[in-house]
Amino acid sequence: MANPQRAGRLAQEVQRDVTDLLLKRINDPRVQDVTVTSVELSGDLQIATIYYSILSDLASDGQKAQAGLEAASGLIRKELGARLTVYKTPELKFVRDQSVQYGNHIEDLIRKLHADN
């Protein structure tokens, strides 16, 4: 198991680099509105779970973004391998972050509560 501080630093570095790659290197329109919200690394630093959000609430846009990220994962991993100073570049797993949608839902509930009073 890796040092937790090292894993945290590496996760931040992966998040910064993936964000940079999505903005500058990936030209796929499906990932145009994707924002990387956080990265979690497995204990052995072999798997990076990348959480992302998109501006649209439509399910079809979420599926398109997921497909675009999966299609670009090979290029992203290759570029990460050149940028990171680790023995083995982690495998990338993209997961849509639901916290933004949940936050919007809570905000709507609070607004309704205030409107009723």
UniProtKB/Swiss-Prot annotation:
Keyword annotations: Cytoplasm, Ribosome biogenesis
Subunit field text: Monomer. Binds 30S ribosomal subunits, but not 50S ribosomal subunits or 70S ribosomes.
Family: Belongs to the RbfA family.
A GO molecular-function annotation: ribosomal small subunit binding
Species classification: Bacteria, Bacillati, Bacillota, Bacilli, Lactobacillales
Cell compartments where the protein resides: Cytoplasm
Official protein name in the record: Ribosome-binding factor A
Source organism of this protein record: Leuconostoc citreum (strain KM20)
InterPro entries in UniProt: KH_dom-like_a/b, RbfA, RbfA_dom_sf, Ribosome-bd_factorA_CS
Gene Ontology biological process: maturation of SSU-rRNA
Transmembrane spans: none
Chief location of this protein within or outside the cell: cytoplasm
GO-annotated cellular components: cytosol
One Pfam family in the UniProt entry: RBFA
